Every structure is written in C-alpha cells, then in structure tokens.
C-alpha cells in the first residue's frame, strides 16, 4: 500500500469496510477510558482515528503523539457508534480503526493553538507556516487558486494569450515610488521592479498579439493599508481593436464568470455605469459602496449668502463645498454618538461636524434641535429641509470646507453610519454584492506644490475624442477614456483606452510639462513604437488579492496571501528586509550613508 491512499477529509461512507492509508497532522489527541482518539488533519479536513489498546505497539505510539505531530496511519473505515456522529464534518459519520501508526516527524509544542481565533497578527505572521495550517487560511488560498484558474479559463476562451513581461525594467513615473534594483554590471545604474506591465502590454499590442494577459506580481513602494501590499498580484489584460464599451462588457462578463464558478454568486446581469462627477457629488468617493443607502445633498449654492460664515465661506471659495448627509431615524442617536462621529471626521481633516435633528418638521425652526439653527435664516432652514427630504425623526449632518475635505469626511461618515449596528438595524445598508463602473475620470489633476498638471491615472490613458483640443489649451477640462470597476466600495479593477498615436502621446507629455528630451529619454521606446502603425487598444488590471479578500470575507489582503508583508513592509517570518554584507554592497558600487544624528 502506498504511503497515502486517501485525503483525511474525503474519507466518507463510500469507503466503509475498506483499509485506507492516511497522512496528516494531529489536530487533537484524546484519551477516553483506555481508547485513544486522534483527530487527523490534512488539507481536505479532519477524520477521527480510533486507537484500540488491543494493538499494543500501535497503542504505545499513539500514547506518545502530540498536537502537530506528522503521522501516517493505516486502518479500517467503519461507521461511528450511534450518538457519536459529527454532522459538522464531511467525514463525521465514519471513523478509522487504526491498525498501524507511524510518526513521520515529531513537533515541538506549537506557540499557539490552531483553533485560537484571538491571535495577534504579529504572532500569526511570525509563525506563518503554522498559521497557514489553519482551516481558514487553507480555504482562502485554495479560493485564490480557483479564482486564478477561472480567470485563465475565461481569458483563454476569449482568445487571450498569456505572455510574461520583464521583472527587471526601467524606472518610469507611474505615481508611487519604484523599488530599485542596482546593476552590478552597469555601475551607478538601476533597474526598477514593475509597478505594472503597462508599457510592455501596450508594446505587445503594437507587436500584433491582439489579446494579452498574465497573472503577475507588481511592486509599489508606498504607505500600506489594509488593502495594500508592497508586492501584489494583478490579472493584467490588454486587447486591440475594441472600444471602451466593448472592453467593459468583456471584463464585466469575466468577473461575473469568476463569481459564479468560485462562490456561486450571480452578479447583476448588467453593471450600472456612473460618471466620476456623479459619484463624487452623491457619495464623495470614486469607489462608492452602493450597499449603503445614504447620499449627499448639495448645498453649496444655497449657502453662498447666509450669515453663518462656517457655511458661506467655503460655499464662496473656488474649491469649497457644502454638503449634507440625511440619516433616516438618526434622531435616535445620542449626543455621545454625535460627539464620536465629530471626532471621527476630524481624522479626514474636518474641523467639526454640524448637525440638525428634525423632531417636528411642521413646526419649522421650533421643531428642530441643533447648535447651528440660531445662525440660519428661516429661508435657509427651509431650503435644507426641502433639499434633503428630511422627515420627523431624522438627523442631518453637514460638512463645509474644501471639496476634498468634505468628500473625504462626509464620505467616511456615510460608510461608518451605514455599516454601524444602528445602520443595520434601520435598513441603511443592504446585503449582497453591488458592482458598478465609474467612468469619465478627469485626465489630469493640478499639483499646487509643483504648479503643474499630473496624470490622474497614468500618462498613457487616452482623452475622450471630444476633449483632444483641450490638451494644449485647457488640460484641466480633459476627461479620460478611463474606467474603474467598483464592488462594495472597493476598486477591484481599473483600466482605460490607451493613446495609440505618437502625436497625441507627445501632447499629453507636454501637458504634463515633460519636455521632448525628457520624454525621449524616459519613453522613447514607446514613442518610437507608436509610429509603426500602433492599433487602437485598451485594457484593464484586476487586483487578485482584493477580489479574493472580498470573496473570503477577510479583514485584510494579508489573509489571502501566503507570505505577506506587514504595514511596515516587513516579512516577520524571514525578517526581511535585512542588512547585507559590505562585500555585496561593494560589488554593487553602493556606499550606505549613515542617517544624520539629531542635534543635542
């Protein structure tokens, strides 16, 4: 008999009466009145093994095994006795009567119990190998595998070709910092790890591969959050001779296919499409969570002439905004709740949080409870109540500041209230999956510090045809042929139609204050390629880590990556990054500069 004939979790009634050979780890060992029970675990699940003292040698071995010992057992599959069936296990109706037990490798005492759900992330990442044995991590990584498989299946069927692009490439500005790799052979010069395969996949379209994809690592040296890692995985795609709508349809179908085949979820037959300007106006975010049934009310124009400077000053500012968020039944919120929300919005730059409770709308001013009502005229109060559609028992929150502060703070408050216990109890958040496309993004953003425009996405995105004329006259008016797929408040994919004509690409570089010499130095290979009959093309990249995180219901993408980094970009398992030998630095022509010591 081979070392293993079955997986533990797959031993069921179909093997009754058969002798099996199993390998795995001891999840738990229990001694019940002279009979030893072992819960044996492998990647497919658990099976109960019964060790009877009638087999003395085997029983002696069983007495010595402990949790996480790696063992092999051979035994007979039989029904569990009446009253001992475990309906929570796939193998819960049977057990294996052990005939032979071999310890393949002993284990020291683990630093934690694998069924402990209250471990710190530091402990889990330091002992990641043990953490990966936990059923939830096994599930997450197998789900990740299935998502990748289904993405490949779909793309293969649609005629896409899997092509690898370089990992050692040229440093080009794409927003975040590059991870640099010094060249030993070319002293003083550096490769960069790719932030994306963006330029190479465009070159593949010029090279007539028509449809490309790869599931690939990308690298960005940026501050980390729950949904960010210094190295992450993209489902990266590019296609020729399709327009923006056709590209969206193609990849919308892919996401529907992946969700249906991996977690049996039917996403909407057609994803809604929302312009960027509408998303910001209604939700203060370009990745709105449509499950939350709360929206902004625009008040900027109505507050321009009020005496209340907190509202009128930003209402009259060039980049100011005044907006309201009506919360149905929010009158139930206590002053402590409101104070907590006030402190919360300060995180996003808000100076405070104005509010009005609507107790009896019919009474006008006298039916309202608020510290700001005394500063507003009756006409302004009436306008607020009418626009927000407030009813008795509601509360209205206000934000008045620079538009970015209003959007960030009120947008975060919308999500916090919507997903709170209060929000759930009052129907302010829906269950399920709410996908959408956000389109018509600004082509450029203005950087006040550098006094120039920067690319909102990347400088290879095509402007909308009707906005080409603005590239040289008014870049701020340009909208891009860019699109993001958003799901439950997460951007899971983003892409665009690309610039395929050299003269348009050069105009974009000029709008970004990238001169001809600099453009040739950094992007000459692209500009040259575009002159050889480059086809119209576009694409998209999906964050595999994010998609799997959402499907798994995990708190962080670190829970769906085998060996992730911390939020300080450290690997606690291998202790990377780490110092290197002076000899290695000399070979790379690198000398470390000691950090300056603070002055006494």
Swiss-Prot record:
Keywords: Aminoacyl-tRNA synthetase, ATP-binding, Cytoplasm, Ligase, Nucleotide-binding, Protein biosynthesis. It comes from the Bacteria. Residues 198-201 are annotated as: Aspartate. Pfam families: GAD, tRNA-synt_2, tRNA_anti-codon. L-aspartate binds at residues 174, 220, 457, 498. The record marks 32, 83 as: Important for tRNA non-discrimination. Its EC number is 6.1.1.23. It is an enzyme of class 6 (ligase). GO terms for cellular component: cytoplasm. Its main location: cytoplasm. InterPro entries: Aa-tRNA-synt_II, aa-tRNA-synth_II, aa-tRNA-synth_II/BPL/LPL, Asp-tRNA-ligase_1, Asp-tRNA-ligase_1_N, Asp/Asn-tRNA-synth_IIb, AspRS_core, GAD-like_sf. It catalyses: tRNA(Asx) + L-aspartate + ATP = L-aspartyl-tRNA(Asx) + AMP + diphosphate. It is found in: Cytoplasm. NCBIfam families: aspS_bact, PRK00476.1. Homodimer. Aspartyl-tRNA synthetase with relaxed tRNA specificity since it is able to aspartylate not only its cognate tRNA(Asp) but also tRNA(Asn). Reaction proceeds in two steps: L-aspartate is first activated by ATP to form Asp-AMP and then transferred to the acceptor end of tRNA(Asp/Asn). This is Aspartate--tRNA(Asp/Asn) ligase. It comes from Burkholderia cenocepacia (strain HI2424). The lineage of its organism: Bacteria, Pseudomonadati, Pseudomonadota, Betaproteobacteria, Burkholderiales.
